[in-house]
């Protein structure tokens, strides 16, 4: 579920792309869990080799996409983007008001990649 998007974005980084990881304020990134847990010096996400490996060299922002302010910030980021990779279940982006039609109206040449861990069908 949370594997495909981060890894696809990491491949893009490795090939020279500038990537901004958009994190949710509601849900912790599945990669944040550390095999070692929190330490005295570091929280789990700082100590997690998995989180650090898949997010190396990415920019990062935390947004509340259920809020209109967070949605507007993402739209602003999209206006300067070439590719958007999302790893949500079906219909989540549309529920946020961030479906492909909306985002392509902002940036017509935007390439949207949807990597749902649950498929794209409706049944």
In which residue ranges do the predicted regions lie?
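N-terminal helix-loop segment corresponding to the beta1-alpha1 unit
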Residues: 1-123
């Amino acid at each position: 579920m949370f594997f495909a998007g981060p890894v696809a974005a990491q491949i893009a980084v490795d090939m020279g792309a500038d990537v901004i990881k958009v994190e949710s304020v509601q849900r912790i990134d599945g990669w944040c869990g550390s095999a070692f847990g929190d330490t005295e010096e570091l929280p789990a996400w700082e100590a997690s080799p998995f989180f650090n490996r898949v997010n190396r060299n990415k920019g990062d922002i935390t947004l509340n996409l259920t809020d209109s302010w967070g949605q507007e910030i993402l739209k602003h980021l999209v206006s300067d983007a070439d590719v958007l990779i999302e790893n949500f279940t079906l219909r989540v982006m549309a529920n946020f008001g961030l479906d492909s039609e909306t985002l392509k109206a902002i940036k017509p040449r935007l390439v949207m990649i949807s990597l749902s861990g649950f498929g794209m069908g409706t049944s």
